[in-house]
């Protein structure tokens, strides 16, 4: 088997395209981030949230979660999974935790704030997550609703840490170094 390396920019574009194809905009996710973080930072703007979502979506782990999750959702819509997995994914069975496991794994890189925020979003289904969780028109979003929650949780955590850095007067050079380290993985 020949090892094939897919260029990062292709993976990034594919992940963005999958979100768009499934009706999820970056603004939808930024709105959730705003709702999560505004109580802790009243100078927060939607543009800050959108920028944080964009940064989170640069991480390969997030991109891979999007690609895998959406692919499985689409296969379930086309009834192309074998049983009993087909029925489990198509119905978003309550005891099927693989969707949450993938999304939670994607949140682990952003620490405890991301993990607890993910749990909150998974339980309360805010914004576009609620729309995705509602089974209408034959669409399956078993994985995507949780992945969107993970992206929003990560962007929220990222903003919380940036706020602390600013409050403590952390130099721009150090903040940019942390920014670069976040893109690993």
What are the functions of these language-model segments?
Residues 31-35, 68, 102-113, 146-154:
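Short, hydrophobic/amphipathic alpha-helical patches that form generic packing surfaces
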Residues 2-12, 114, 119:
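Internal, hydrophobic cores of structured domains that mediate oligomerization or house catalytic pockets
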Residues 36, 40, 50, 70, ...:
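Short, surface-exposed, charged/polar-biased interaction segments
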Residues 6-73:
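N-terminal interaction modules that seed assembly of large macromolecular complexes
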Residues 4, 8, 22, 42, ...:
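Intrinsic-disorder-associated interaction segments
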């Amino acid at each position: 088997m020949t090892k094939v390396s897919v260029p990062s920019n292709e993976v990034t574009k594919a992940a963005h395209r999958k979100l768009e194809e499934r009706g999820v905009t970056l603004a939808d996710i930024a709105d959730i981030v705003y709702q999560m973080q505004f109580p802790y930072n009243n100078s927060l703007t939607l543009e800050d949230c959108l920028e944080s979502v964009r940064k989170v979506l640069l991480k390969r782990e997030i991109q891979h979660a999007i690609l895998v999750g959406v692919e499985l959702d689409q296969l379930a819509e086309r009834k192309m999974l074998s049983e009993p997995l087909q029925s489990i994914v198509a119905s978003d069975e309550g005891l099927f935790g693989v969707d949450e496991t993938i999304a939670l794994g994607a949140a682990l890189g952003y620490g405890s704030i991301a993990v607890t925020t993910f749990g909150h979003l998974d339980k309360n289904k805010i914004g576009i997550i609620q729309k995705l969780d509602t089974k209408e028109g034959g669409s399956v979003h078993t994985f995507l609703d949780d992945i969107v929650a993970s992206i929003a949780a990560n962007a929220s955590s990222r903003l919380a840490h940036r706020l602390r850095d600013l409050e403590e007067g952390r130099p721009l050079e150090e903040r940019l170094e942390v920014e670069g380290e976040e893109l690993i993985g």
